[in-house]
């Protein structure tokens, strides 16, 4: 099949296009909703029942997505127009096999295979000429010590394969080496390598969203969303804002030009059609941008685009349109946000099934609460997000944080608040 320009939309269960999502979490759920607005039939596949995406899909399957046999059986039964991986825990060999059989894997099997593995991804990014931090690889404690010494302290260690920043560690001195190695070893899954990176003293970490799609003439075309800012706590997204800065001077214009250049190069290197989310570090003082990682699908930091972007232009809508072969209408190369907005996570600090939420204090003017619908709560699991709009980035960030910190979560008859305050406004 492959991707084709789509000029006719149909009806689910009849003559509409069909998308299959491998992984049906909160990000997949939002993409599904956008696709359903265009009359698309949705099939959700995940490792557990009643995942967020399954709650809105037309049909769903629970299976081990690392099993080739299981994936092939579901795909052959459903025969989707496109297969959209949402998580890393997938048998990528099967994706290549399906692609050879004519199925469209979004953005393409090679992009998924590359982006899920930090060594492959870092080498791919470096090959484009994009600026990166210095880096070394290690396989055991001795080579890890040597890599840290060569890079110098402070430095950052990460497993070659992990999701949502698991196993990442900032080493401030040689005293942190053994602890960092143990953290990486716990999270590195099937890989035996760890990457050690130079610590970049950046002002802001940004997500640059880029999208490749078929234009009205059926030719490949690319667009870029103005970057959004975000911060992480222990490797996990905690808050994001869009645009990344209120400033619009020549220095910012120059930095953004470099951001779009890097995003375009990396997207071209990975290939395929869909949305790409590029994590980068920006050193505004020295006018430098460092490419860090890329996800070839919507990113958790991009949840803010639900509030910031024009209707039909959130990261989820852009991904759905690109995968379906629908042109993205925009004057120029850069899609600008409609509103200044921010997001802030709602975390669980309790454990149990079927969480409940006290949200009465979170509904301030120009704010909204998104509950993902995950059936199980455990410590620091992301269960929802607050979105807020305001006149400035600073005000939007404060508003989202304030609202999120009024939310309480219960899964065992005990209510717990939002306890993490690191990097927060006081």
Swiss-Prot record:
Residues involved in Mg(2+) binding: 279, 293
Keywords: ATP-binding, Ligase, Magnesium, Metal-binding, Nucleotide-binding, Purine biosynthesis
Keyword Transport on entry: no
Signal sequence coordinates: none
Gene3D superfamilies given in the database record: 3.40.50.20, ATP-grasp fold, A domain, ATP-grasp fold, B domain
Any single Gene Ontology cellular-component annotation: cytosol
EC number: 6.3.1.21
Catalytic reaction equation(s): N(1)-(5-phospho-beta-D-ribosyl)glycinamide + formate + ATP = N(2)-formyl-N(1)-(5-phospho-beta-D-ribosyl)glycinamide + ADP + phosphate + H(+)
Pathway: Purine metabolism; IMP biosynthesis via de novo pathway; N(2)-formyl-N(1)-(5-phospho-D-ribosyl)glycinamide from N(1)-(5-phospho-D-ribosyl)glycinamide (formate route): step 1/1
Domain ATP-grasp residues, every copy: 123-324
Domain of life of the source: Archaea
Top-level class of the enzyme under EC nomenclature: ligase
Binding-site list for N(1)-(5-phospho-beta-D-ribosyl)glycinamide: 26-27, 86, 300, 374, 381-382
Residues the entry annotates as binding ATP: 118, 158, 197-200, 205
Molecular-function GO terms, alphabetical: ATP binding; magnesium ion binding; phosphoribosylglycinamide formyltransferase 2 activity; phosphoribosylglycinamide formyltransferase activity
InterPro entries, A to Z: ATP-grasp (IPR011761), ATP-grasp_carboxylate-amine (IPR003135), ATP_grasp_subdomain_1 (IPR013815), PreATP-grasp_dom_sf (IPR016185), PurT (IPR005862), PurT/PurK_preATP-grasp (IPR054350), PurT_C (IPR048740), Rudment_hybrid_motif (IPR011054)
Oligomeric form and interacting partners: Homodimer.
Family: Belongs to the PurK/PurT family.
Function: Involved in the de novo purine biosynthesis. Catalyzes the transfer of formate to 5-phospho-ribosyl-glycinamide (GAR), producing 5-phospho-ribosyl-N-formylglycinamide (FGAR). Formate is provided by PurU via hydrolysis of 10-formyl-tetrahydrofolate.
Protein name: Formate-dependent phosphoribosylglycinamide formyltransferase
Gene (name only): purT
